């Protein structure tokens, strides 16, 4: 997860512009 998360977080930030903490947390959960 640690390796895949950073890559996805960057994509989410660029696309949605939403904080990776909120978006990533919900998406991963």
From Swiss-Prot:
A single MF term (Gene Ontology): oxidoreductase activity
Annotated keywords: Acetylation, Membrane, Mitochondrion, Mitochondrion inner membrane, Oxidoreductase, Transmembrane, Transmembrane helix
Main location: mitochondrion
Residues that span the membrane, as ranges: none
Residues modified to N6-acetyllysine: 10
Keyword Membrane: yes
Compartments where located: Mitochondrion inner membrane
PANTHER family: CYTOCHROME C OXIDASE POLYPEPTIDE 7A, CYTOCHROME C OXIDASE SUBUNIT 7A2, MITOCHONDRIAL
Function of the molecule: Component of the cytochrome c oxidase, the last enzyme in the mitochondrial electron transport chain which drives oxidative phosphorylation. The respiratory chain contains 3 multisubunit complexes succinate dehydrogenase (complex II, CII), ubiquinol-cytochrome c oxidoreductase (cytochrome b-c1 complex, complex III, CIII) and cytochrome c oxidase (complex IV, CIV), that cooperate to transfer electrons derived from NADH and succinate to molecular oxygen, creating an electrochemical gradient over the inner membrane that drives transmembrane transport and the ATP synthase.
The protein's name: Cytochrome c oxidase subunit 7A2, mitochondrial
Gene designation per UniProt: COX7A2
């Amino acid at each position: 997860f640690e390796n895949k998360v950073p890559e996805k977080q960057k994509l989410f930030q660029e696309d949605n512009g939403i904080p990776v903490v909120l978006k990533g947390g919900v998406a991963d959960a």
